[in-house]
Protein backbone atom coordinates (compact mmCIF):
# COMPACT_ATOMS: atom_id res chain seq x y z
CA UNK A 1 0.00 0.00 0.00
CA UNK A 2 2.47 2.61 -1.10
CA UNK A 3 -0.30 4.97 -2.18
CA UNK A 4 -1.61 7.05 0.73
CA UNK A 5 -5.11 7.39 -0.75
CA UNK A 6 -6.02 4.02 0.82
CA UNK A 7 -5.33 5.14 4.39
CA UNK A 8 -7.86 6.70 6.74
CA UNK A 9 -6.87 7.85 10.22
CA UNK A 10 -9.78 8.65 12.49
CA UNK A 11 -10.88 8.68 16.11
CA UNK A 12 -14.25 8.64 17.81
CA UNK A 13 -15.51 11.53 19.93
CA UNK A 14 -18.39 10.75 22.27
CA UNK A 15 -19.69 11.41 25.75
CA UNK A 16 -19.36 8.74 28.46
CA UNK A 17 -21.77 5.87 27.76
CA UNK A 18 -22.75 6.90 24.24
CA UNK A 19 -21.36 3.63 22.93
CA UNK A 20 -17.99 4.41 21.35
CA UNK A 21 -16.20 1.31 22.68
CA UNK A 22 -19.06 -0.90 21.45
CA UNK A 23 -18.90 0.73 18.02
CA UNK A 24 -15.16 0.04 18.01
CA UNK A 25 -15.91 -3.63 18.75
CA UNK A 26 -18.22 -3.77 15.71
CA UNK A 27 -15.56 -2.24 13.46
CA UNK A 28 -13.04 -4.84 14.62
CA UNK A 29 -15.55 -7.63 14.09
CA UNK A 30 -16.58 -6.50 10.60
CA UNK A 31 -13.03 -6.02 9.41
CA UNK A 32 -11.93 -9.38 10.81
CA UNK A 33 -9.41 -7.99 13.29
CA UNK A 34 -10.08 -10.86 15.73
CA UNK A 35 -11.57 -14.32 15.38
CA UNK A 36 -15.03 -14.90 16.86
CA UNK A 37 -13.45 -16.75 19.79
CA UNK A 38 -11.17 -13.87 20.78
CA UNK A 39 -13.91 -11.28 20.48
CA UNK A 40 -15.12 -9.95 23.82
CA UNK A 41 -17.08 -6.88 24.80
CA UNK A 42 -14.99 -3.70 24.85
CA UNK A 43 -11.89 -5.28 23.35
CA UNK A 44 -9.97 -2.03 23.49
CA UNK A 45 -10.54 -1.30 27.17
CA UNK A 46 -7.68 -3.55 28.19
CA UNK A 47 -7.07 -2.24 31.72
CA UNK A 48 -9.06 -4.10 34.41
CA UNK A 49 -10.05 -0.75 35.82
CA UNK A 50 -11.51 0.35 32.49
CA UNK A 51 -13.66 -2.75 32.29
CA UNK A 52 -14.91 -2.47 35.87
CA UNK A 53 -15.87 1.16 35.67
CA UNK A 54 -17.06 0.87 32.08
CA UNK A 55 -15.05 3.89 30.97
CA UNK A 56 -12.15 4.33 28.58
CA UNK A 57 -9.12 5.86 30.30
CA UNK A 58 -6.27 5.43 27.84
CA UNK A 59 -6.36 6.05 24.11
CA UNK A 60 -5.91 2.79 22.15
CA UNK A 61 -5.08 2.28 18.51
CA UNK A 62 -6.15 -0.39 16.02
CA UNK A 63 -5.33 -0.93 12.36
CA UNK A 64 -8.07 -2.60 10.32
CA UNK A 65 -8.45 -3.47 6.63
CA UNK A 66 -11.86 -2.72 5.17
CA UNK A 67 -12.98 -3.83 1.71
CA UNK A 68 -15.31 -1.08 0.51
CA UNK A 69 -18.14 -1.36 -2.01
CA UNK A 70 -15.98 0.21 -4.72
CA UNK A 71 -13.77 -2.89 -4.51
CA UNK A 72 -10.76 -1.14 -2.95
CA UNK A 73 -9.31 -2.24 0.37
CA UNK A 74 -8.77 0.63 2.79
CA UNK A 75 -6.46 0.66 5.77
CA UNK A 76 -8.29 2.21 8.72
CA UNK A 77 -6.16 3.42 11.61
CA UNK A 78 -8.58 3.98 14.40
CA UNK A 79 -7.77 5.54 17.78
CA UNK A 80 -10.27 5.06 20.60
CA UNK A 81 -10.48 8.04 22.95
CA UNK A 82 -11.84 8.55 26.48
CA UNK A 83 -15.01 10.58 27.02
CA UNK A 84 -14.64 11.76 30.61
CA UNK A 85 -13.85 15.43 31.28
CA UNK A 86 -10.70 14.49 33.26
CA UNK A 87 -9.11 12.82 30.25
CA UNK A 88 -9.52 15.58 27.67
CA UNK A 89 -5.76 15.70 27.05
CA UNK A 90 -5.82 12.03 25.97
CA UNK A 91 -8.39 13.06 23.39
CA UNK A 92 -6.37 15.98 22.04
CA UNK A 93 -3.36 13.69 21.66
CA UNK A 94 -5.36 11.15 19.70
CA UNK A 95 -6.83 13.84 17.47
CA UNK A 96 -3.36 15.11 16.57
CA UNK A 97 -2.74 11.79 14.81
CA UNK A 98 -5.94 11.82 12.73
CA UNK A 99 -7.47 13.52 9.69
CA UNK A 100 -11.03 12.97 10.80
CA UNK A 101 -13.28 12.13 13.72
CA UNK A 102 -16.64 10.41 14.17
CA UNK A 103 -18.91 12.35 16.49
CA UNK A 104 -21.02 9.61 18.08
CA UNK A 105 -24.21 10.84 19.75
CA UNK A 106 -26.74 8.73 21.64
CA UNK A 107 -29.99 9.16 19.66
CA UNK A 108 -32.00 9.04 22.89
CA UNK A 109 -29.91 11.33 25.10
CA UNK A 110 -28.80 13.96 22.62
CA UNK A 111 -25.68 16.12 22.67
CA UNK A 112 -23.70 16.39 25.92
CA UNK A 113 -21.24 19.08 27.01
CA UNK A 114 -18.17 16.88 26.89
CA UNK A 115 -18.60 15.89 23.26
CA UNK A 116 -19.16 19.55 22.38
CA UNK A 117 -15.80 20.45 23.93
CA UNK A 118 -13.96 17.59 22.21
CA UNK A 119 -15.66 18.39 18.93
CA UNK A 120 -14.40 21.96 19.04
CA UNK A 121 -10.88 20.65 19.74
CA UNK A 122 -11.19 18.49 16.61
CA UNK A 123 -12.46 21.36 14.46
CA UNK A 124 -9.66 23.64 15.73
CA UNK A 125 -7.11 21.02 14.70
CA UNK A 126 -8.64 21.04 11.21
CA UNK A 127 -10.26 17.60 11.33
CA UNK A 128 -13.25 16.53 9.26
CA UNK A 129 -16.05 15.74 11.75
CA UNK A 130 -18.69 13.20 10.72
CA UNK A 131 -21.81 12.87 12.91
CA UNK A 132 -23.17 9.38 13.72
CA UNK A 133 -26.40 8.67 15.64
CA UNK A 134 -25.96 5.59 17.80
CA UNK A 135 -28.44 3.48 19.80
CA UNK A 136 -31.12 3.78 17.11
CA UNK A 137 -32.64 0.46 18.25
CA UNK A 138 -33.81 1.99 21.54
CA UNK A 139 -37.49 2.94 21.83
CA UNK A 140 -36.61 6.45 23.06
CA UNK A 141 -34.41 7.26 20.03
CA UNK A 142 -35.44 10.58 18.49
CA UNK A 143 -33.12 11.19 15.52
CA UNK A 144 -34.73 14.42 14.28
CA UNK A 145 -34.44 16.17 17.65
CA UNK A 146 -30.83 15.04 18.04
CA UNK A 147 -29.85 16.16 14.51
CA UNK A 148 -31.38 19.51 15.32
CA UNK A 149 -29.34 19.68 18.56
CA UNK A 150 -26.09 18.80 16.76
CA UNK A 151 -26.69 21.66 14.31
CA UNK A 152 -27.74 24.18 16.98
CA UNK A 153 -25.22 23.36 19.69
CA UNK A 154 -22.14 22.31 17.73
CA UNK A 155 -22.92 24.00 14.44
CA UNK A 156 -22.04 21.23 11.96
CA UNK A 157 -24.38 19.98 9.26
CA UNK A 158 -26.15 16.83 10.48
CA UNK A 159 -28.89 16.41 7.87
CA UNK A 160 -27.29 13.24 6.52
CA UNK A 161 -25.89 11.90 9.81
CA UNK A 162 -25.58 8.11 9.65
CA UNK A 163 -27.99 6.22 11.91
CA UNK A 164 -26.72 2.98 13.43
CA UNK A 165 -26.87 0.75 16.47
CA UNK A 166 -23.49 -0.49 17.61
CA UNK A 167 -25.06 -3.08 19.86
CA UNK A 168 -27.15 -4.84 17.22
CA UNK A 169 -24.76 -4.03 14.36
CA UNK A 170 -27.42 -2.20 12.34
CA UNK A 171 -26.03 0.44 9.96
CA UNK A 172 -22.39 -0.07 10.99
CA UNK A 173 -21.28 -0.96 7.44
CA UNK A 174 -22.89 2.28 6.26
CA UNK A 175 -20.82 4.17 8.86
CA UNK A 176 -17.64 2.60 7.44
CA UNK A 177 -18.67 3.37 3.82
CA UNK A 178 -19.41 7.00 4.65
CA UNK A 179 -16.20 7.26 6.65
CA UNK A 180 -14.06 6.13 3.71
CA UNK A 181 -15.65 8.81 1.50
CA UNK A 182 -15.90 11.68 3.99
CA UNK A 183 -12.60 11.57 5.85
CA UNK A 184 -9.62 12.75 3.78
CA UNK A 185 -6.55 10.59 3.16
CA UNK A 186 -3.35 11.60 4.97
CA UNK A 187 -0.69 13.66 3.21
CA UNK A 188 2.98 12.80 3.28
CA UNK A 189 5.92 11.58 1.19
CA UNK A 190 7.13 8.02 1.66
CA UNK A 191 10.56 8.86 0.22
CA UNK A 192 11.09 11.96 2.38
CA UNK A 193 13.23 11.75 5.57
CA UNK A 194 11.43 10.09 8.49
CA UNK A 195 9.30 12.35 10.67
CA UNK A 196 7.04 10.68 13.26
CA UNK A 197 5.02 11.99 16.19
CA UNK A 198 4.85 10.02 19.46
CA UNK A 199 1.18 9.85 20.47
CA UNK A 200 1.60 7.63 23.51
CA UNK A 201 4.23 5.51 25.16
CA UNK A 202 4.27 2.94 27.94
CA UNK A 203 6.89 0.90 29.73
CA UNK A 204 7.15 -2.84 29.27
CA UNK A 205 9.42 -4.75 31.65
CA UNK A 206 10.79 -6.91 28.80
CA UNK A 207 10.78 -4.59 25.81
CA UNK A 208 11.58 -1.25 27.45
CA UNK A 209 9.66 1.77 26.18
CA UNK A 210 6.99 0.99 23.57
CA UNK A 211 5.91 4.08 21.60
CA UNK A 212 2.74 4.52 19.59
CA UNK A 213 3.59 6.83 16.67
CA UNK A 214 1.94 8.50 13.71
CA UNK A 215 4.36 8.61 10.78
CA UNK A 216 4.06 11.95 8.96
CA UNK A 217 6.84 11.57 6.37
CA UNK A 218 9.14 8.77 5.27
CA UNK A 219 9.27 5.22 6.59
CA UNK A 220 10.83 3.31 9.50
CA UNK A 221 11.76 -0.38 9.62
CA UNK A 222 13.53 -2.85 11.89
CA UNK A 223 17.28 -2.17 12.10
CA UNK A 224 16.97 1.60 11.47
CA UNK A 225 18.75 3.96 13.82
CA UNK A 226 16.26 6.51 15.13
CA UNK A 227 16.97 9.83 16.80
CA UNK A 228 14.67 11.18 19.52
CA UNK A 229 14.65 14.95 18.87
CA UNK A 230 14.22 16.20 22.45
CA UNK A 231 16.90 14.01 24.07
CA UNK A 232 19.24 13.83 21.06
CA UNK A 233 19.85 10.12 21.75
CA UNK A 234 20.04 7.47 19.02
CA UNK A 235 18.37 4.05 19.40
CA UNK A 236 18.29 0.93 17.23
CA UNK A 237 14.79 -0.16 16.18
CA UNK A 238 14.04 -3.74 17.33
CA UNK A 239 10.61 -4.04 15.76
CA UNK A 240 7.77 -2.02 14.28
CA UNK A 241 4.16 -3.03 13.83
CA UNK A 242 0.50 -2.32 14.36
CA UNK A 243 -2.25 -3.44 16.72
CA UNK A 244 -4.98 -5.40 14.98
CA UNK A 245 -5.86 -5.24 18.11
CA UNK A 246 -3.24 -7.96 18.66
CA UNK A 247 0.42 -6.95 18.68
CA UNK A 248 1.39 -7.64 15.02
CA UNK A 249 4.86 -6.98 13.63
CA UNK A 250 5.11 -5.55 10.12
CA UNK A 251 8.01 -4.96 7.74
CA UNK A 252 7.86 -1.18 8.09
CA UNK A 253 5.68 1.80 9.00
CA UNK A 254 5.15 4.31 6.19
CA UNK A 255 3.92 7.90 5.98
CA UNK A 256 0.28 8.21 7.05
CA UNK A 257 0.30 5.06 9.19
CA UNK A 258 -0.12 4.66 12.93
CA UNK A 259 1.75 1.88 14.74
CA UNK A 260 4.27 1.04 17.42
CA UNK A 261 8.05 1.24 17.53
CA UNK A 262 10.16 -0.73 20.01
CA UNK A 263 13.78 0.36 20.22
CA UNK A 264 14.83 -1.14 23.58
CA UNK A 265 14.87 2.29 25.21
CA UNK A 266 15.49 1.48 28.87
CA UNK A 267 15.37 5.03 30.19
CA UNK A 268 11.82 5.86 31.21
CA UNK A 269 12.13 9.41 29.89
CA UNK A 270 13.75 8.26 26.65
CA UNK A 271 10.73 8.85 24.40
CA UNK A 272 8.45 11.55 25.80
CA UNK A 273 4.92 11.87 24.43
CA UNK A 274 4.55 14.63 21.84
CA UNK A 275 8.16 14.25 20.72
CA UNK A 276 9.40 13.82 17.14
CA UNK A 277 11.37 10.80 15.88
CA UNK A 278 13.61 10.80 12.82
CA UNK A 279 16.49 8.73 11.43
CA UNK A 280 19.96 9.40 12.83
CA UNK A 281 21.13 10.07 9.26
CA UNK A 282 18.75 13.05 8.89
CA UNK A 283 18.99 14.95 12.20
CA UNK A 284 17.96 18.27 10.59
CA UNK A 285 14.28 17.24 10.20
CA UNK A 286 11.83 19.80 11.64
CA UNK A 287 10.24 19.08 15.02
CA UNK A 288 6.49 18.47 14.70
CA UNK A 289 4.23 20.70 16.76
CA UNK A 290 3.52 18.51 19.79
CA UNK A 291 0.77 18.90 22.35
CA UNK A 292 0.46 21.69 24.83
CA UNK A 293 1.72 20.58 28.25
CA UNK A 294 -1.34 20.04 30.32
CA UNK A 295 -1.52 21.75 33.71
CA UNK A 296 -2.77 19.70 36.66
CA UNK A 297 -5.81 21.19 38.38
CA UNK A 298 -5.84 19.23 41.63
CA UNK A 299 -2.98 18.38 43.95
CA UNK A 300 -2.94 15.73 46.65
CA UNK A 301 -0.26 14.08 48.75
CA UNK A 302 0.28 10.36 48.20
CA UNK A 303 2.19 8.53 50.92
CA UNK A 304 3.13 4.85 51.20
CA UNK A 305 1.61 3.28 54.33
CA UNK A 306 4.93 1.62 55.12
CA UNK A 307 8.00 3.82 54.66
CA UNK A 308 9.96 0.85 53.25
CA UNK A 309 7.89 1.10 50.06
CA UNK A 310 9.12 4.61 49.26
CA UNK A 311 11.66 3.51 46.59
CA UNK A 312 9.15 1.19 44.88
CA UNK A 313 6.59 3.98 44.99
CA UNK A 314 8.99 6.36 43.25
CA UNK A 315 9.75 3.84 40.48
CA UNK A 316 6.04 3.13 40.02
CA UNK A 317 5.30 6.85 39.66
CA UNK A 318 8.05 7.22 37.06
CA UNK A 319 6.66 4.38 34.96
CA UNK A 320 3.13 5.70 35.26
CA UNK A 321 4.16 9.22 34.24
CA UNK A 322 5.52 7.84 30.99
CA UNK A 323 2.13 6.35 30.20
CA UNK A 324 0.14 9.28 31.56
CA UNK A 325 1.94 12.48 30.69
CA UNK A 326 -0.43 14.72 32.62
CA UNK A 327 0.56 13.27 35.99
CA UNK A 328 3.12 15.45 37.77
CA UNK A 329 4.80 14.75 41.08
CA UNK A 330 7.43 16.09 43.45
CA UNK A 331 8.75 14.73 46.75
CA UNK A 332 7.06 15.95 49.92
CA UNK A 333 7.36 15.11 53.59
CA UNK A 334 4.67 15.37 56.21
CA UNK A 335 5.07 15.25 60.00
CA UNK A 336 2.10 12.93 60.24
CA UNK A 337 2.72 10.64 57.28
CA UNK A 338 6.45 10.62 56.61
CA UNK A 339 7.88 10.79 53.08
CA UNK A 340 5.74 10.70 49.95
CA UNK A 341 4.95 12.71 46.83
CA UNK A 342 2.77 15.68 46.05
CA UNK A 343 1.03 14.69 42.83
CA UNK A 344 -0.87 16.85 40.35
CA UNK A 345 -3.99 15.44 38.67
CA UNK A 346 -6.54 16.68 36.15
CA UNK A 347 -9.53 16.02 38.39
CA UNK A 348 -10.93 13.73 41.03
CA UNK A 349 -11.62 10.79 38.71
CA UNK A 350 -8.05 10.99 37.42
CA UNK A 351 -6.79 10.96 41.02
CA UNK A 352 -8.86 7.89 41.95
CA UNK A 353 -7.76 6.06 38.81
CA UNK A 354 -4.06 6.81 39.41
CA UNK A 355 -4.28 5.68 43.03
CA UNK A 356 -6.04 2.46 42.01
CA UNK A 357 -3.52 1.80 39.23
CA UNK A 358 -0.62 2.29 41.64
CA UNK A 359 -2.18 -0.04 44.18
CA UNK A 360 -3.08 -2.73 41.63
CA UNK A 361 -0.36 -2.67 39.03
CA UNK A 362 2.51 -1.98 41.44
CA UNK A 363 1.13 -3.61 44.58
CA UNK A 364 1.49 -0.58 46.88
CA UNK A 365 -0.50 0.51 49.93
CA UNK A 366 -1.09 4.25 49.79
CA UNK A 367 -2.66 6.99 51.88
CA UNK A 368 -4.05 10.00 50.01
CA UNK A 369 -4.50 13.39 51.64
CA UNK A 370 -7.42 15.64 50.80
CA UNK A 371 -6.96 17.22 47.36
CA UNK A 372 -6.44 20.94 46.96
CA UNK A 373 -6.21 23.32 44.00
CA UNK A 374 -3.52 25.94 43.30
CA UNK A 375 -3.89 29.30 45.03
CA UNK A 376 -2.06 32.51 44.23
CA UNK A 377 -0.93 34.66 47.15
CA UNK A 378 0.36 38.20 47.07
CA UNK A 379 2.59 38.81 50.06
CA UNK A 380 2.99 42.15 51.79
CA UNK A 381 6.57 42.24 50.49
CA UNK A 382 5.04 42.52 47.00
CA UNK A 383 6.03 39.10 45.68
CA UNK A 384 3.48 36.61 44.33
CA UNK A 385 3.70 32.94 45.26
CA UNK A 386 1.70 29.85 44.29
CA UNK A 387 0.58 27.35 46.90
CA UNK A 388 -0.79 23.89 46.15
CA UNK A 389 -0.61 22.50 49.67
CA UNK A 390 -2.58 24.01 52.57
CA UNK A 391 0.15 23.07 55.07
CA UNK A 392 2.65 25.25 53.14
CA UNK A 393 0.61 28.44 53.54
CA UNK A 394 2.59 31.34 55.00
CA UNK A 395 1.37 33.15 58.12
CA UNK A 396 -1.88 35.05 57.49
CA UNK A 397 -0.33 38.31 58.71
CA UNK A 398 2.19 38.18 55.83
CA UNK A 399 -0.46 37.82 53.10
CA UNK A 400 -1.83 40.92 51.36
CA UNK A 401 -4.16 39.17 48.92
CA UNK A 402 -5.44 35.62 48.56
CA UNK A 403 -6.53 34.60 45.03
CA UNK A 404 -8.36 31.42 44.09
CA UNK A 405 -8.66 29.87 40.62
CA UNK A 406 -11.99 30.44 38.84
CA UNK A 407 -13.22 28.12 36.09
CA UNK A 408 -15.82 28.72 33.41
CA UNK A 409 -18.22 25.80 33.60
CA UNK A 410 -20.56 25.03 30.71
CA UNK A 411 -23.51 22.88 31.71
CA UNK A 412 -26.02 21.34 29.29
CA UNK A 413 -29.22 20.29 31.03
CA UNK A 414 -32.84 19.45 30.05
CA UNK A 415 -35.22 22.29 30.96
CA UNK A 416 -37.04 20.38 33.71
CA UNK A 417 -33.84 20.02 35.78
CA UNK A 418 -32.64 23.60 35.29
CA UNK A 419 -33.87 24.85 38.68
CA UNK A 420 -31.95 22.22 40.67
CA UNK A 421 -28.78 22.87 38.70
CA UNK A 422 -28.96 26.63 39.29
CA UNK A 423 -29.51 26.07 43.04
CA UNK A 424 -26.46 23.81 43.15
CA UNK A 425 -24.29 26.34 41.26
CA UNK A 426 -25.28 29.13 43.65
CA UNK A 427 -24.52 26.92 46.66
CA UNK A 428 -21.05 26.38 45.15
CA UNK A 429 -20.50 30.19 44.93
CA UNK A 430 -21.09 30.29 41.17
CA UNK A 431 -21.88 33.46 39.18
CA UNK A 432 -24.09 33.04 36.13
CA UNK A 433 -22.59 34.33 32.87
CA UNK A 434 -25.23 33.43 30.30
CA UNK A 435 -28.06 31.04 29.47
CA UNK A 436 -29.21 29.79 26.06
CA UNK A 437 -32.22 27.65 25.23
CA UNK A 438 -31.25 25.14 22.52
CA UNK A 439 -34.12 22.88 21.55
CA UNK A 440 -35.20 20.96 24.64
CA UNK A 441 -31.89 21.62 26.40
CA UNK A 442 -30.51 24.67 28.15
CA UNK A 443 -26.87 25.66 28.08
CA UNK A 444 -25.79 27.66 31.15
CA UNK A 445 -22.35 29.14 31.73
CA UNK A 446 -21.12 29.82 35.25
CA UNK A 447 -17.93 31.22 36.72
CA UNK A 448 -17.17 29.04 39.73
CA UNK A 449 -14.29 28.57 42.16
CA UNK A 450 -12.29 25.57 40.98
CA UNK A 451 -12.06 24.38 44.56
CA UNK A 452 -15.83 23.79 44.60
CA UNK A 453 -16.00 22.23 41.12
CA UNK A 454 -13.15 19.82 41.51
CA UNK A 455 -14.14 18.08 44.74
CA UNK A 456 -17.63 16.70 44.31
CA UNK A 457 -19.48 19.03 41.95
CA UNK A 458 -19.65 16.48 39.13
CA UNK A 459 -21.30 13.83 41.33
CA UNK A 460 -23.72 16.31 42.86
CA UNK A 461 -24.63 17.67 39.41
CA UNK A 462 -25.39 14.18 38.15
CA UNK A 463 -27.56 13.32 41.15
CA UNK A 464 -29.54 16.57 41.18
CA UNK A 465 -30.34 16.28 37.46
CA UNK A 466 -30.98 12.49 37.56
CA UNK A 467 -27.91 11.96 35.39
CA UNK A 468 -29.02 14.20 32.51
CA UNK A 469 -26.83 17.26 33.03
CA UNK A 470 -23.36 17.23 31.53
CA UNK A 471 -20.42 19.42 32.40
CA UNK A 472 -17.33 20.80 30.74
CA UNK A 473 -15.02 23.29 32.43
CA UNK A 474 -11.75 25.09 31.82
CA UNK A 475 -9.57 27.39 33.91
CA UNK A 476 -10.26 31.07 33.38
CA UNK A 477 -8.46 33.32 35.88
CA UNK A 478 -7.41 33.96 39.48
CA UNK A 479 -9.70 36.13 41.59
CA UNK A 480 -9.39 37.60 45.09
CA UNK A 481 -11.39 35.78 47.73
CA UNK A 482 -11.75 35.78 51.49
CA UNK A 483 -10.08 32.47 52.22
CA UNK A 484 -8.69 31.03 55.44
CA UNK A 485 -6.73 27.97 56.42
CA UNK A 486 -8.59 25.48 58.58
CA UNK A 487 -6.29 23.41 60.78
CA UNK A 488 -7.27 20.19 62.48
CA UNK A 489 -5.76 19.50 65.90
CA UNK A 490 -5.85 16.06 67.44
CA UNK A 491 -5.02 16.11 71.15
CA UNK A 492 -3.61 19.59 70.71
CA UNK A 493 -1.23 18.66 67.86
CA UNK A 494 -1.77 20.04 64.37
CA UNK A 495 -2.04 17.29 61.76
CA UNK A 496 -0.56 18.95 58.67
CA UNK A 497 -2.07 16.43 56.26
CA UNK A 498 -5.60 17.35 57.35
CA UNK A 499 -5.36 21.12 56.84
CA UNK A 500 -7.61 22.63 54.19
CA UNK A 501 -8.32 26.03 52.66
CA UNK A 502 -11.93 27.22 52.89
CA UNK A 503 -13.95 30.37 52.31
CA UNK A 504 -14.38 32.34 55.52
CA UNK A 505 -18.19 32.27 55.26
CA UNK A 506 -18.19 28.46 55.25
CA UNK A 507 -15.38 28.03 57.77
CA UNK A 508 -17.44 27.52 60.94
CA UNK A 509 -19.83 25.11 59.21
CA UNK A 510 -16.99 23.17 57.56
CA UNK A 511 -15.07 23.04 60.85
CA UNK A 512 -18.04 21.61 62.75
CA UNK A 513 -18.85 19.12 60.00
CA UNK A 514 -15.24 18.00 59.81
CA UNK A 515 -14.80 17.43 63.55
CA UNK A 516 -18.09 15.49 63.68
CA UNK A 517 -17.01 13.36 60.73
CA UNK A 518 -13.59 12.70 62.30
CA UNK A 519 -15.26 11.67 65.55
CA UNK A 520 -17.05 8.88 63.68
CA UNK A 521 -13.88 7.74 61.93
CA UNK A 522 -11.19 7.81 64.61
CA UNK A 523 -11.40 4.62 66.67
CA UNK A 524 -11.82 4.98 70.45
CA UNK A 525 -8.57 4.83 72.40
CA UNK A 526 -7.77 4.15 76.05
CA UNK A 527 -7.89 7.91 76.67
CA UNK A 528 -10.06 10.84 75.52
CA UNK A 529 -9.12 12.19 72.09
CA UNK A 530 -9.94 15.85 71.50
CA UNK A 531 -10.53 16.82 67.86
CA UNK A 532 -10.49 20.55 67.21
CA UNK A 533 -10.82 22.76 64.15
CA UNK A 534 -8.97 26.06 64.29
CA UNK A 535 -8.44 29.15 62.16
CA UNK A 536 -5.12 30.63 63.21
CA UNK A 537 -5.23 30.60 67.01
CA UNK A 538 -9.01 30.54 67.30
CA UNK A 539 -10.72 27.19 67.92
CA UNK A 540 -14.04 27.13 66.06
CA UNK A 541 -15.24 23.59 66.73
CA UNK A 542 -14.44 20.68 69.01
CA UNK A 543 -15.59 17.13 69.59
CA UNK A 544 -14.21 14.42 71.85
CA UNK A 545 -13.85 10.74 71.15
CA UNK A 546 -14.62 9.27 74.58
CA UNK A 547 -12.15 6.84 76.16
CA UNK A 548 -12.81 3.15 76.49
CA UNK A 549 -12.76 2.36 80.21
CA UNK A 550 -12.93 -0.66 82.35
CA UNK A 551 -15.50 -0.75 85.12
CA UNK A 552 -13.10 -0.61 88.10
CA UNK A 553 -15.98 -0.62 90.60
CA UNK A 554 -17.24 -4.04 89.59
CA UNK A 555 -15.41 -5.81 92.41
CA UNK A 556 -16.61 -3.44 95.17
CA UNK A 557 -20.19 -4.58 95.86
CA UNK A 558 -21.75 -2.30 98.53
CA UNK A 559 -18.49 -0.92 99.90
CA UNK A 560 -17.50 2.55 101.05
CA UNK A 561 -17.77 5.55 98.73
CA UNK A 562 -14.21 6.68 99.51
CA UNK A 563 -12.93 3.29 98.33
CA UNK A 564 -14.79 3.76 95.02
CA UNK A 565 -13.42 7.28 94.69
CA UNK A 566 -9.89 6.05 95.23
CA UNK A 567 -10.24 3.46 92.44
CA UNK A 568 -11.77 6.00 90.02
CA UNK A 569 -9.04 8.57 90.77
CA UNK A 570 -6.41 5.92 90.21
CA UNK A 571 -7.95 5.06 86.84
CA UNK A 572 -8.11 8.75 85.91
CA UNK A 573 -4.44 9.25 86.75
CA UNK A 574 -3.51 6.24 84.62
CA UNK A 575 -5.48 7.60 81.64
CA UNK A 576 -3.83 10.99 82.04
CA UNK A 577 -0.38 9.41 82.00
CA UNK A 578 -1.35 7.37 78.96
CA UNK A 579 -2.56 10.45 77.13
CA UNK A 580 0.83 12.12 77.50
CA UNK A 581 2.66 9.33 75.72
CA UNK A 582 -0.19 7.90 73.62
CA UNK A 583 -0.30 8.21 69.83
CA UNK A 584 -3.56 8.36 67.94
CA UNK A 585 -3.69 6.20 64.82
CA UNK A 586 -5.59 8.08 62.12
CA UNK A 587 -7.22 5.77 59.56
CA UNK A 588 -7.12 6.51 55.79
CA UNK A 589 -10.88 7.28 55.74
CA UNK A 590 -10.29 10.21 58.07
CA UNK A 591 -7.98 11.90 55.55
CA UNK A 592 -10.67 11.69 52.91
CA UNK A 593 -13.47 12.77 55.27
CA UNK A 594 -12.78 16.28 54.05
CA UNK A 595 -14.18 15.35 50.64
CA UNK A 596 -17.45 14.05 51.89
CA UNK A 597 -18.45 16.85 54.19
CA UNK A 598 -21.74 17.48 52.42
CA UNK A 599 -22.89 13.91 52.20
From Swiss-Prot:
One of its GO terms (molecular function) is guanosine tetraphosphate binding. Its EC number is 3.6.5.n1. It catalyses: GTP + H2O = GDP + phosphate + H(+). Belongs to the TRAFAC class translation factor GTPase superfamily. Classic translation factor GTPase family. LepA subfamily. This is Elongation factor 4. The gene is lepA. It is found in: Cell inner membrane. GO terms for biological process: positive regulation of translation.
Amino acid sequence: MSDLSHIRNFSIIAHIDHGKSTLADRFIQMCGGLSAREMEAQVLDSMDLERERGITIKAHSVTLHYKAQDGKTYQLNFIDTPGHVDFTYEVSRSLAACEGALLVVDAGQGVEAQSVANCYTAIEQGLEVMPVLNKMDLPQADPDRVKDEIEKIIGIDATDAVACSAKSGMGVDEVLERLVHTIPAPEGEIDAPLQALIIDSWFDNYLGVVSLVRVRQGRVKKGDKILVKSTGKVHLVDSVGVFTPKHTQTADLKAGEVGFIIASIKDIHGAPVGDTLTLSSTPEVEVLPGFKKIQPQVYAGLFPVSSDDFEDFRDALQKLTLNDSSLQYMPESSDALGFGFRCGFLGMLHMEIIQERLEREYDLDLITTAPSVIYELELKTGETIVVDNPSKLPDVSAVADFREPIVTATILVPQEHLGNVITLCIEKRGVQRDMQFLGSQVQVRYDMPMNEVVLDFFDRLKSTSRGYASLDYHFDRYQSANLVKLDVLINGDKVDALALIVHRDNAAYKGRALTEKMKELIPRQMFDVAIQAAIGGQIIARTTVKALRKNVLAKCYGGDVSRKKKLLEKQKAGKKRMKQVGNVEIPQEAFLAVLRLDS
